[in-house]
Amino acid sequence: MTLQLRFRLSLAVLCTVLIASALVVLSEAQSKETWNAPAAEAQKKNPVAATESALAAGQKIYSKTCAMCHGKTGDADGPAVIELNIHPAKLSDPKLATESDGALFWKITTGKKPMPAYGKRLSETDRWNLVNYIRTLPKR
């Protein structure tokens, strides 16, 4: 291997490491910034009663679309956390109880990277069912 080729290879490796490091730092910084719903959205009331069937529907949606990152019990320990190096919200955090249903609904609807927006993927009723189910997750 020539000296010039070694230099180029070393430079490519160094650039890759620097870019990867920058992405990790940016990802962590983004995950720590606050995410507040607009006041009008936060004031919305949940029109879907937390009936047994609504909670079952919410649990099914959660298992299918949320647990991969947020974990089965909302502890932010789903399998994608390690694979994708993401830091999802810990839905079992007692602070979540201070969020209004409207705020949770808005966050589910609009998303924030790396969390996708579900406004077009889930019906309005499904999103409210999801809010109801998230409320049942144990807080610790």
Sequence positions of predicted segments:
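N-terminal secretory signal peptides that target proteins for export/translocation
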Residues: 1-7
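Extracytoplasmic electron-transfer domains, predominantly the class I c-type cytochrome c fold
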Residues: 83-137
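Sequence/structural segment immediately N-terminal to covalent heme-attachment motifs in c-type
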Residues: 52-75, 81, 104-110
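Electrostatic cytochrome c docking/interface patches
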Residues: 31-61
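Bacterial N-terminal signal peptides
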Residues: 12-22
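Short, non-ligating residues that shape and space the ligands of small metal-coordination modules
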Residues: 75-76, 124
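Short, flexible, mixed-charge acidic loops at enzyme active sites
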Residues: 35-37, 79-84
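Sec/Tat signal peptide C-region and signal peptidase I cleavage site
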Residues: 23-29
